[in-house]
Structure formats: structure tokens, C-alpha cells
């Protein structure tokens, strides 16, 4: 399948550069995955579309301030490091700039020596393996010295670091935020609970591969990046109970979707406690096994994320919805507006 089938025209001014002042004031496009019907709403209207007995699945990963600026100990040359994946102990897979200056044995110093890293080898796609040394607690030092690794299409400086975290972020380890969750406030989540909507939490640590463009000409040639996920016994039991009682499982974001669909694929359609690495790639033709609805932002043209959404809601429906979003001047990407996709015609509003 040609990746150009997932292209659409997006004016640059529709790429949201900063978050809205209030999280929940974003717009919400409601798309019926079967009929293609569209409604234009605000995010707080999600209360009308979720019903007692439904379950929202939220990714409680927390974004690391994963971008570090340091100097080579021998020459003083500036080096930028982006943490991608913790391998074991203090060893990390990273991207470094300029990569040609960092060879095996190179020592990089951050924060006047508060944190040091030694290059122990190369990694995939031009990356470097670094081993860190420090006194104290690594994540506390990282919190002091690191910067949030905003996506490459965001050019503005983020004034409030917390705006690139969900209000329920808990498990540190992501190089990017699960952005569909950024629209929720604690008050909105409380209102959903009062309505009888269940909240279930999983963890999937988002890697920077989520921003990598598809370089192959056809979908089938593309290989997905792997990301670590975890679902507890408590969450699995809740999801199975919701299913048994006829409720819907609504994932917040493509990361929650990838987690549930990975587990269901690996366990004959069942949801159970599991941890591991997933490189699942969902595109048209994929049959969903776990979810009934999806809340997600508007994604990049020709990205694996728009392919996932097209697998769930039909490519023609999705591209029509995206063209409508452009026409109606919705905000796109990480700090942009949201979609809620499900079989709405069957449910109606309550």
C-alpha cells in the first residue's frame, strides 16, 4: 500500500506551537467510524459521548527532560544528547549532535561535571550508547539539567514544562508525551468518574520513533520502532469486567491503543497483565481486537499514526475528516485539538 494514500494538505499555520491556556478548551471533532459523519464540538463535550459503564484507558507515562547540553571533556566542544531508551543500569541509547565528534571512549560533561557520560559504542540509526556517572539520584539530576524534548515541528519555547505532561503522568520514561491525554484536567476526569465512567491506567514509554517519517515507499516495507509497555493485573481485570458488562473500551491516544492491541494479539484476543516491547504496526486491513473507541489528536501526513487511525475508522472517512479539520481551522499535532472516534450512531448521546 502506497504511503501517499495517507497524504493531505496541511497549512503550516495550523500546526499548534503552544498549548492553549486551559487544557480542556481545545476543540473536539466527533467522527463516526462507520458512517463517516462528523460533529464539531469542544473537548468538555466528551462528557456527553461517554456513558456509565464505559472505560477510558489512559497512558500514565511521564516525559523525561531528555535533552541535555554538555561539553567534551578533552576539547570543550558543545554536544547535545537526547536520551532515547534506558538499556540497563546507567547505560542509555541516545542520539548525539554532532555525532561525528562522539566516538567510543569520548567523555561528555554536563552541569559543570554534575553528570558525566562515556560513549561505549554505537547504536541504531547513528545513535550512541552512553554510560552515565553521577553522585545522587539520576532522575533528580536530569530534572535539574535536562530540557523537554519537544517534537521537531514545534519551534516555540515551552514556558511551563508541566504543559507537556498529562495531569496523571506517573511512570517516568518517555521521550515524548502521549498527547491525546493533554486535554484532560483533574476536574474533567472527576466528572467522568461521577458519571460512572471507569478509568484504567497502562504504561507505554513513548520513543522518538513516533516522530520518524516513514521512509519506505510502501507501508509493508516500514519497520516500527519498539516501545516498552506494561499493563497490571488490576487494569486487566477492570477491562475484562467492563467488556463482560457490555461497556465500551475507549483508548486515550495511539499509545494506549498499541498497548491493548499488542496484548490482545499476543493472547488470542484476551486482555491480561503483561509487560514487554511492542513494534505493532496498525494500518488498513488490521482487525481491532480490544478497543471500541479512540480519542486522539490530529496527526502528520503519511505518518504511522494517521495509518493507525485509518485502520480504525476507514481511510476515506479519516481523510475526509482531516480535510474538514483543515477547512475549519482545527489545531494540529501535539498541542492541537482532538478527535473522538467510535460507532456513535449505535450509541447516541445520553
From Swiss-Prot:
User: Where is the protein found, in the record's own terms?
Assistant: Cytoplasm
**Which Gene Ontology BP annotations are present?**
queuosine biosynthetic process; tRNA wobble guanine modification
Q: Which domain of life is it from?
A: Bacteria
Q: What is its main location?
A: cytoplasm
The family database entries (InterPro entries) matched by this protein are listed as:
QueA (IPR003699), QueA_dom1 (IPR042118), QueA_dom2 (IPR042119), QueA_sf (IPR036100)
Assigned EC number: 2.4.99.17
Report a single Gene Ontology molecular function: S-adenosylmethionine:tRNA ribosyltransferase-isomerase activity
Record's family?
Belongs to the QueA family.
Looking up NCBIfam families in the UniProt record yields: PRK00147.1 (NF001140), queA (TIGR00113)
The role this protein plays is: Transfers and isomerizes the ribose moiety from AdoMet to the 7-aminomethyl group of 7-deazaguanine (preQ1-tRNA) to give epoxyqueuosine (oQ-tRNA).
Q: Report what the protein is called.
A: S-adenosylmethionine:tRNA ribosyltransferase-isomerase
**Taxonomic classification, please?**
Bacteria, Bacillati, Bacillota, Bacilli, Bacillales
The encoding gene: queA
